Amino acid sequence: MKRIFLFIATNIAVIAVMSVVLSLLGVDRFISQAGLNLPMLLVFSLVVGFTGSIISLLISKPMAKWSTGARVIDAPSSSTELWLIDTVSKLAQRAGIKMPEVAVYDGEPNAFATGAFRDSALVAVSTGLLQSMTKDEVEAVLAHEVAHVANGDMVTMTLVQGVVNTFVVFLSRVVGYFVDRAISRDNNNSQGIGYTITVIVSQIVFGIAASVIVAWFSRHREFRADAGAAKLLGSPQPMMKALARLGGIEPTSLPEGLASLGINDKPGFAALFSSHPPIEDRIAALRSLQ
């Protein structure tokens, strides 16, 4: 979840800055100076949308290090760090990718992988995860993150986010144009304060709605990463036990009726915005691989 949250947050910030700068430069006025020019607006939206997501991808690794305080293990200083390096190296070799950077950061049990390219990625784990899980469970989590890298999930998410950004930028300006025309007393096509306010509000509203699409796609990729981890480890059992540990289930039991235990990342409406599927669904999917 941390990986997706950082990417989306950075993307939103980049899009917001680009929108403000381009508005100050008069690009919005140029597009609508002779009426609403939809083809030109679409090109503008594509450029802004994909530029924002690509910039977010390119800076994802340094942003992740900075925001989490992650420390890259250059020279292992303990047996745990040496084990982490050896384990990630082994998993990366199995997955057919180059050795990622390995980092540790202080925090609750969590892990993430990020980076613009498959062969220059970062895999990070929290101290909380290392302290609360067995080595087999940590290895399963690492396999899950390596699978994300091998699947090219960050690049795929960039493409999805770019398309989503395009529609958000496009639709917000179309709505802004018509609202401005409806409340404006001028017959010319100059933009008023109504346009600016409507575009800002629309980008926020459409951006929130679009995040549901991004979150849905992210949940789909999590199932694939779980399956990838099972393949790397030769069995789905370690990943099932790691997920059970994260969900607060006794990992040695793994009962069939997981739903009755109330394990869910985000219940109800909030589940639409969750980047991860419910843990019981992920374990059920892994069980089907046996």
UniProtKB/Swiss-Prot annotation:
GO terms for biological process: proteolysis. One of its GO terms (molecular function) is zinc ion binding. Binds 1 zinc ion per subunit. The chain crosses the membrane at residues 4-24, 39-59, 159-179, 197-217. Keywords: Cell inner membrane, Cell membrane, Hydrolase, Membrane, Metal-binding, Metalloprotease, Protease, Transmembrane, Transmembrane helix, Zinc. It is an enzyme of class 3 (hydrolase). It is found in: Cell inner membrane. GO terms for cellular component: plasma membrane. Its cofactor is Zn(2+). The active site is at E145. The keyword Isomerase does not apply. Its EC number is 3.4.24.-. Pfam families: Peptidase_M48. It is a multi-pass membrane protein. Signal peptide: none annotated. Zn(2+) binds at H144, H148, E222. Belongs to the peptidase M48B family. This is Protease HtpX homolog.
